[in-house]
Amino acid sequence: MVVQTRYPSWIILCYIWLLGFAHTGEAQAAKEVLLLDSKAQQTELEWISSPPSGWEEISGLDENYTPIRTYQVCQVMEPNQNNWLRTNWISKGNAQRIFVELKFTLRDCNSLPGVLGTCKETFNLYYYETDYDTGRNIRENLYVKIDTIAADESFTQGDLGERKMKLNTEVREIGPLSKKGFYLAFQDVGACIALVSVKVYYKKCWSIIENLAVFPDTVTGSEFSSLVEVRGTCVSSAEEEAENSPRMHCSAEGEWLVPIGKCICKAGYQQKGDTCEPCGRRFYKSSSQDLQCSRCPTHSFSDREGSSRCECEDGYYRAPSDPPYVACTRPPSAPQNLIFNINQTTVSLEWSPPADNGGRNDVTYRILCKRCSWEQGECVPCGSNIGYMPQQTGLEDNYVTVMDLLAHANYTFEVEAVNGVSDLSRSQRLFAAVSITTGQAAPSQVSGVMKERVLQRSVELSWQEPEHPNGVITEYEIKYYEKDQRERTYSTLKTKSTSASINNLKPGTVYVFQIRAFTAAGYGNYSPRLDVATLEEASGKMFEATAVSSEQNPVIIIAVVAVAGTIILVFMVFGFIIGRRHCGYSKADQEGDEELYFHFKFPGTKTYIDPETYEDPNRAVHQFAKELDASCIKIERVIGAGEFGEVCSGRLKLPGKRDVAVAIKTLKVGYTEKQRRDFLCEASIMGQFDHPNVVHLEGVVTRGKPVMIVIEFMENGALDAFLRKHDGQFTVIQLVGMLRGIAAGMRYLADMGYVHRDLAARNILVNSNLVCKVSDFGLSRVIEDDPEAVYTTTGGKIPVRWTAPEAIQYRKFTSASDVWSYGIVMWEVMSYGERPYWDMSNQDVIKAIEEGYRLPAPMDCPAGLHQLMLDCWQKERAERPKFEQIVGILDKMIRNPSSLKTPLGTCSRPISPLLDQSTPDFTAFCSVGEWLQAIKMERYKDNFTAAGYNSLESVARMTIDDVMSLGITLVGHQKKIMSSIQTMRAQMLHLHGTGIQV
């Protein structure tokens, strides 16, 4: 039997007693769950010691003089020590990862004499995992070593004397664990050691409320780096945010990390701390997305807590489309100051807004028309035969025109202001009313049209007077056209009787005839269509019959021939006079094989009527233009001068209507009759147009002096000057929008059969909203002061730079030639009002165009827009796009702005920019300095040299950004240099055989 020698236990016990006075106990961290704490047990621990003579349990005191149980061992005199100490079975609960905290003291072996070969300063920590208590037997081979524990500090005999306390604390972790519990074991191999305390615990994240979500107690994961995701539960009266459920992650250290998502208080509740409290009375919250409760809007209330919306007060309403936060509103009061103006069977109504709009901004107006019998005092709705301009309901403006009323009838009109809650109100309607009696109306439809006689080249017709002439019929108008040519043109004939013979028809052709009557009140509706086929060409038998007749009565034949010859001569003279008379330009130049009164497109399109067809020009003016009282016009200032007189700005105030800003063209004093006719001719043309992109004619003054034409006022003036004034200030989309408006106006004119002939940016006017409108409908005046602006040919002056080649050479003006001019306008707009072809002479322009050269793309012009310009400049007019197609192309560009970012050079087919004799041959220059001197930009020579542009080849590759990077800040100089670079690049391509003419 080996007797083990140990140092006296009082040495260690004394040290432990000293520790009790020096050590302050640590409070248990809230995230730790204790499984074992030896300090908390005041009775004997009764752990298993093997051998029994090894570890021994002793008592001590803590800082509060509370007894604590410790184990010590100090068998340092003998070698090969193997002393085991095992705890009782420890249940792990829900833990997967366990922490063991050891507090111990250890004697310095050097302070003990005679033990250098046997004394150790470490011990081993083990554990054994099991589902139940296995008894008191320690089976060492089943234990798994956790670690070898060494002291950071060991104590000596001197430390005891000096009361120096050296307590070591070590923490080790175990896991992951899979069984219900485990044992801890401590192996001494020859150290002098005392286990002051053993604490076993695991960590978990304690329950918290975060973002209005409750997260329960959660045990940490099995690995040090693991995060356990936990889904929260919303507190009372809260709900999960859409597609953003509340989640948090429990870390291995027992801390909540990475909050994701949240809960939000339901409608009617707001957050207060970690709870949702109901909205108070007179408050509401309509959506869980709102943060706080809001006070009820005006004229609404809530009489309970937790309201999600407020109810409207009596007499107030909320429209279905109104959000809950807007005030309750009511229907508007009646419109004010209702006035009317009667023009035969048309009534214009105008009024002022209601004094009370009910608190809403969506006030519109609706009109109720009643036809009344004064004798019986009864009124009935007018029915669907009445027309309203612009509409009967949903009116945003405070005026309306009611048309197609019966003549000499009594009507009552009620004008009601309505808003979004008018239909919800049960109150009586509020409206303004006016009663009127109509005057004379246009005649009703002509009836009973019959063909009396049909020959090869003539047709005789007869008809009955209208059932309701509504006045004295002064003439009838017969409209006729070839049935298979109805898409092109028609002709008219006027007569004062109820029969007529229409001559100069084609044999064997079907014609369509319609007739309408005219009174002082205007034209009535056309009669139903009557189709008549002329006879075929005469056969041989008819010639024989004619010969026999001539033999029988030669005197009659001679007389007939003489009369016929006289009539033909008269018609030739008359036709010559008509052909020579013109309004701004000769209609003989208009394309077509016949001299026709009208050019008309079917179906349903309003037709342009040439004022030349009127024997009396005054009649054309009064048919298409409203005669104004000069007293209604106030001239304020002169804004320009034209060929016929001054152009002024002023105001037009018609009775019962608002005054509007207008532009006034005046006819100068001492005018000739021809000048007066030409002056009013433009009004006769403008009066036929009604389109938002065509300048609107307000009326004319012909019965006083000065003679005036009054048109709408366009605040920004001519487009070319406007663009030059605002150079570089618009986006590409804005410029394309302007071009789209011009194209829409030209499409309207083309559909009416009107050819403009002088489409240019100077003849486009711009209003305050940047709406562009086509103007200038007379070509008789000088186009510009510059004599080079026009090229004189037989028959008049032509604006060469804007005119199609066939119009210059053959005077063939068509909608296709207007398309060419529109392409030039596009170039003007994209270049901010630059002069087309710059300083080239007109002869050089004509020559360059004939050779196939076209204007290059302006700076920063998208390739798609330049391609459209080139399409408009096709030599063959049939290959040019129609205005309808141009509008469609521009609409697509506006709907797809990315298409306007296409860089130049990506066109569908190669092009060659303008090259002509007046353009310098940039390829002949030897240096960049010579080139700059040629374009008068030599001041920037040093800029180019400093940036490394020493060859023309490198210059030809420059972009606008490169030019700007040289410090060239003047926009005009940037444009001039870039234009020259583009031309240089084109010449280089042309020199190498890659340039292709259009």
From Swiss-Prot:
Residues 577-998 are cytoplasmic. It is a single-pass type I membrane protein. Restricted to the nervous system. The modification Phosphotyrosine is found at Y608, Y614, Y791, Y940. GO terms for biological process: axon guidance; brain development; branching morphogenesis of a nerve; ephrin receptor signaling pathway; modulation of chemical synaptic transmission; negative chemotaxis; negative regulation of collateral sprouting; negative regulation of phosphatidylinositol 3-kinase/protein kinase B signal transduction. Keywords: Apoptosis, ATP-binding, Cell membrane, Developmental protein, Glycoprotein, Kinase, Membrane, Neurogenesis, Nucleotide-binding, Phosphoprotein, Receptor, Repeat, Signal, Transferase, Transmembrane, Transmembrane helix, Tyrosine-protein kinase. Its main location: membrane. The chain crosses the membrane at residues 556-576. Phosphorylated. InterPro entries: Eph_TM (IPR027936), EphA7_rcpt_lig-bd (IPR034283), Ephrin_rcpt_lig-bd_dom (IPR001090), Ephrin_rcpt_TKs (IPR050449), FN3_dom (IPR003961), FN3_sf (IPR036116), Galactose-bd-like_sf (IPR008979), Growth_fac_rcpt_cys_sf (IPR009030). A motif (PDZ-binding) lies at residues 996-998. CDD domains: EphR_LBD_A7, FN3, PTKc_EphR_A, SAM_EPH-A7. Residues 633-894 form the Protein kinase domain. The active site is at D758. Residues 28-555 are extracellular. Its EC number is 2.7.10.1. Glycans are attached at N343, N410. Residues 1-27 form the signal peptide. Residues 32-210 form the Eph LBD domain. This is Ephrin type-A receptor 7. It comes from Rattus norvegicus (Rat).
